């Protein structure tokens, strides 16, 4: 309705634009941008409009923010993503993960992808607000939204939050392993809603969180089937066809399979060639990892490693960094176990090597939305009252 009204205004169809805006405000009476456009349309009966907010006596930063919101919303409608295209960062989503969220901070959009029979389909997208000073968080309090690969970590119902957060919140696991490597600080980055008297916020308005309109947060929650949903936050999405993604990922997949085969070989030096000099894991550097692997492999007569449910994402803004998660089934004559593993791989001179590996976070909470409230099915460890922070 909003984009249709803007098109009507551009074509000088004032009456048609009024009908669309009236319908919009009937559904969303707290939509401030809609009220601004309504005022402009009333003024247009007396004289031509020059800019949005022409009828406001004293234009200021608030009107500029509403103009910026209108521009971002109109751009999405006039420049939609190509049909069937995927974000540049998406190489593979695990078969057991139903959804993927991708935030394009430059266009103020959150895109929802659903895994349908092994094919990723874009099923929804929403306008969002990000940090007051943009994207690329580096330190606590810098009012920026982080750029990276994260996942939702549970949910917080509106009953446990102030009205500022609207219909609830989905915390993200910022800082991730790469953030910590870069000495980035801060915490409490959430996807959350808006106060009840506010339909949406300007494009740059939070302290770093990603903020959605309440109705759209509720729609998002109704789609998600678990709390551990991958979230990619990118400075700008470049859209590519799935076959282009598969071609770009082929070299990485060969490196991953070579790592698995070399681990099974029990040739520790061959296996260690897949680890970079800056490798770290759970307090061990490469030298300590080498000593550990030499000791444990010497005691084994066979090793078998299975990899399933693989997800691979290229890091936003860094074509030489990939984040991988998978279910690992390990068997030897002395040990058998299963785990969800996360690895960070870095490419140097065309060679992919591991700079971090460790256990991946397991889902803790299932979420659903009913009549404007997030319903939680939570582990006991997640029942403590959250520390309230504003963003």
Per-region residue spans from a language model:
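Surface-exposed, charged secondary-structure patches
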Residues: 96, 294-342
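Alpha-helical segment of the N-proximal tetratricopeptide repeat
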Residues: 1-23, 27, 254-265
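Exported/periplasmic cell-wall-interacting domains
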Residues: 154-257
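Short beta-strand edge/turn micro-motifs at domain boundaries
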Residues: 336-375, 383, 387
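Gly/Pro-biased beta-strand-loop elements
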Residues: 78-190, 194-200
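Short, well-ordered alpha-helical segments enriched in acidic and aromatic residues
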Residues: 265-278, 282
